[in-house]
Each structure stands twice: as structure tokens, then as C-alpha cells.
UniProtKB/Swiss-Prot annotation:
Gene: gltX
Organism of derivation: Herminiimonas arsenicoxydans
Localisation per UniProt entry: Cytoplasm
CDD domains reported for this sequence: GluRS_core
Protein name: Glutamate--tRNA ligase
GO cellular component, as recorded: cytosol
Length: 467
């Protein structure tokens, strides 16, 4: 592989469930590496596990990728649609002697492994049907279909320079002759992956370190095919805040749980980018910056820790930066589910502009914004406490001011201060009952901003109920 070889990366999930956080990070790093070099990002669906693969899982993976904006350049390619190609390669390997038929039954193989375990040996296929010079093979059993095994080298080592973990060496004696086609002819995982990586000219395989043990097997198959080897990089796992492997008990692990919980895709991408990669002290950056900066040299070897509070902080940053009209489109359906009344109500983007500074999620923003979209129901005891006889004359004067004041925050603020000065009141003495009357709540943004957004007609009507 030369410096001029076009970079080709791939994301190759098995559709046996949702797109999880670890898979999304793998996809992001593979996508970013291709983008950094102007290369090609391939999406491949490894669906040969017929018992566990489902169309629903395929759709969930594609939806997760689309939500994150990780658009593939080629694919999606489905392994189940490449069966003719796999059969062709298996036939070539059988003809070349790099694969062979094995007629050992599953019961015989299991008994073989039990004997090896009892002897303290590593369980492995013993090569009964492996052709060797001068070796006489057993008679072929009647009515038994064979599997096809890869003829793994018996001597030497498999060594590769992992871009994350450094040099890794596995002795071929640790590897047995892998089944590459089952009795029904369907090819197996490691074989399909090797053929696909070769056919698709993948130059860099970035994946989780749970695949490290697959790598020497795939390398040996690729060598047997005379294929060029890709570079491999195995990412350490993602841990929960407690140091255990990230799982459902830590909260959401499916990527598509996050939009439902009110996270923006750009926040999720930014957060995932920092799970196992760094660029100095930069915490917040755009995907354009990320793809410009991203390289494999700064991937960390130690497991990354998923910190929900850090994700909340980043999400808050992006909510504050986001266009209010876009946010309105995202939270309006949530608010409708909460019973929001939008007729004769304040402009939602304007409300969002007032409320979004401190919220961590869109769900929180939707709940907070409901202040402006439901009928107030102030607590009677709080009204008695705050709407006192001493305050009512000031409230009446404020109403008169509201009837004629120029409707804007500055003018409303000046009018309120004039009333306070006239009646020798402090701001909370009038602002608290106003908040209760107008919104039903004691905690709101500044009363001037609240009054401005509700508008003259609504504010006067609500105050009139209490004078």
C-alpha cells in the first residue's frame, strides 16, 4: 500500500440489534478518516447470521447513521446478496488447496475438544480431514455433508502493527482450521469479512477491540487470497461512569434513544469524537474541524468513559448555538404531547430564545417552554402570600401603564420601575404576584421579558381576574 493509495474505510455492523454508542463511535472515526483524506466511506451490512439478523435492525442502524449525519459514499452492501461471490472464492480456495472439505460431525468435533480440555490443551480442530503429503484421509461418511475449512498455516506468526494498540503477534499454532462454509453452503463471518475487505479495497479497518481475535484469522485468509492487507486499528471499549462496560443499566445505549431524550446530533457527534481521541484541550468543535484534525495517531489505548454529565454540557452548548426556528420545529411535537395551546400564544422561537440558556436537553426545553402555552393555575396559598392588600394598588397602577406603554422590554421595565417607586415597593414584591398571575409559577425569566412575550391583551386579561 503506497502513500498514493486512495483511502477506503468501512463501517460493517451486524444487524442483530440497534446501533449502539460504541458502534456509532466506530462509524464516526471511520467516516472522519475517509473525509480527512478525501477518501471513501463504505457501509456494509454483515447479515449472514440468519437467526439473529432482522430487517428492523438494519433499518435502526441506517436511521442512526442518518440522524448522526454519517453519510456513506458506497453501499449499503449486504453480505447475503454476495453469496455467489463467496461460493466462487471458496471454489477457488478448494482448487488451490487453501481450503478443504471436512466431514467431522459436530458431535465428533465437540468430543475432540472435550479430550483436549481434559488434557489441559487449547480446544481446536485436530486436522483429521486436513490433506497432507503422504496422509491417508478417512473414508467419507455416507449421507454426511461436509463443511469447508480454511487451511491455516501451522508454523510462524501473524503480526500486524495495530494503529491503536501497536504491534500484535499471534502464533499460528493458536489458530485452528477455521470453518469458512457450513454444511448448507453458507459462508461464515471471518471468511466473508476478508473477502469483502479485499473486494471493496478497504485500506483501513477501524473497529472495536472485541475484533482483535478475528484479525489474525482474516489476515491469513487475505494472504491465501493474495490480497493486499489493510491497516487495522482496534478501539478500546467504552465504559460507564462506574468503570463497568457500558450497558443498558447506564442509561441509553442505542443511538436512537438520544434524539428521543432531547439530544442534538451535533452534540452527540462532538461527544463521541472525544471518546478515545483528543486534539489538545479542545472540547467543542464542529464536524468540519474534526475531519480536518482527525488522525489515527491520537487515538487512546485505554478505555473511554461515558460521562452523561459531559454529554449534557455539550448538548447545552449546541442548544444555545442552534437556530431558534430549528429548535421550535424539534420541540413543538413534544409540547403538543404535553398539551400545549398555541392559539393566541407567544412566538415559539422567541420563547426558545429566552428559555434555552440553561437547559440540558430539548425535552427540558419543551417542558420549560410550556410556561407560555398553558392556562395558569396559581396556587391559592401562594397568591394569598404574595398578592397582598399592600400590593394591589401598585398592580392596578401597573395595569393602567400597560394599557398605553410602548410594547417592548425597555419600556415595560421603565413602567414597572415607576410603579415600584411610586408605591415604595421592591421588585420581588410586585414581580412575584405578577409571575403567579400571568404564568402560575414563581420561577420564570425576568418579568419584563415574560410580559413582553405574552403580549398586552393576554397580560391585561390575566391580571383583570385578580383585581
Amino acid at each position: 500500500m503506497t502513500a498514493r493509495t486512495p483511502i477506503r474505510t468501512r463501517f460493517a455492523p451486524s444487524p442483530t440489534g440497534y446501533l449502539h454508542v460504541g458502534g456509532a463511535r466506530t462509524a464516526l472515526f471511520s467516516w472522519a478518516y475517509a473525509r480527512h483524506f478525501g477518501g471513501t466511506f463504505v457501509l456494509r451490512i454483515e447479515d449472514t447470521d440468519l437467526e439473529r439478523s432482522t430487517p428492523e435492525a438494519v433499518q435502526a442502524i441506517i436511521e442512526g447513521m442518518e440522524w448522526l449525519g454519517l453519510h456513506h459514499d458506497e453501499g449499503p452492501f449486504y453480505q447475503m446478496q454476495r453469496m455467489d461471490r463467496y461460493r466462487e472464492v471458496i471454489a477457488q480456495m478448494l482448487a488451490a488447496g487453501t481450503a478443504y472439505y471436512c466431514y467431522s460431525s459436530s458431535e465428533e468435533v465437540e468430543a475432540m475438544r472435550e479430550r483436549q480440555r481434559a488434557a489441559g490443551e487449547k480446544p481446536r480442530y485436530d486436522g483429521t480431514w486436513r490433506p497432507e503429503a503422504g496422509k491417508t484421509l478417512p473414508a467419507i461418511p455416507a449421507d454426511r455433508k461436509p463443511v469447508v475449512r480454511f487451511r491455516n498455516p501451522m508454523e510462524g506468526d501473524v503480526t500486524w502493527l495495530d494503529v491503536v494498540k501497536g504491534q500484535i503477534t499471534i502464533s499460528n499454532r493458536e489458530l485452528d482450521d477455521l470453518v469458512i462454509a457450513r454444511q448448507d453452503g453458507t459462508p461464515t463471518y471471518n471468511f466473508c469479512v476478508a473477502v469483502d475487505d479485499s473486494d471493496m479495497k478497504i485500506t483501513h479497518v477501524i473497529r472495536g477491540d472485541d475484533h482483535v481475535n478475528n484479525t489474525p484469522r482474516q489476515i491469513n485468509i487475505l494472504k491465501a487470497l493474495g490480497a493486499e492487507l489493510p491497516h487495522y486499528g482496534h478501539l478500546p471499549m467504552i465504559l460507564g461512569a462506574d468503570g463497568a462496560k457500558l450497558s443498558k443499566r447506564h442509561g441509553a445505549v442505542s443511538v436512537m434513544d438520544y434524539p428521543a431524550q432531547g439530544y442534538l446530533p451535533e452534540a452527540m457527534l462532538n461527544y463521541l469524537a472525544r471518546l478515545g481521541w483528543s486534539h489538545g484541550d479542545d472540547e467543542v468543535f464542529s464536524m468540519e474541524q474534526f475531519t480536518e484534525w482527525f488522525d489515527l495517531d491520537h487515538l487512546t489505548k485505554s478505555p473511554a468513559q461515558f460521562d452523561p454529565e459531559k454529554l449534557d454540557w455539550i448538548n447545552n452548548h449546541y442548544i444555545k448555538q442552534a437556530d431558534n426556528t430549528r429548535l421550535a420545529g424539534l420541540i413543538k411535537p413534544m409540547m403538543e404531547n404535553l398539551g400545549a395551546q398555541f392559539d393566541n400564544a407567544p412566538d415559539l422561537p422567541a420563547v426558545i430564545g429566552l428559555m434555552k440558556e440553561r437547559v440540558k436537553t430539548l425535552n427540558e426545553l419543551a417542558v420549560t417552554a410550556m410556561l407560555f402555552y398553558r392556562q395558569p393555575a396559581p396556587d391559592a396559598a401562594l397568591l394569598t402570600q404574595h398578592l397582598t392588600d399592600a400590593v394591589k394598588p401598585a398592580l392596578a397602577q401597573y395595569v393602567e401603564q400597560l394599557k398605553t406603554v410602548a410594547w417592548g422590554k425597555d419600556a415595560l421595565s421603565a413602567a414597572l420601575k415607576e410603579v415600584l417607586a411610586t408605591h415604595k415597593l421592591k421588585m420581588p414584591q410586585l414581580a412575584m404576584p405578577l409571575r403567579l398571575i400571568i404564568t402560575g409559577q414563581l420561577q420564570t425569566p425576568s418579568i419584563d421579558a415574560v410580559v413582553e412575550l405574552f403580549g398586552r391583551e393576554v397580560v391585561l386579561a390575566r391580571i383583570a381576574n385578580y383585581l
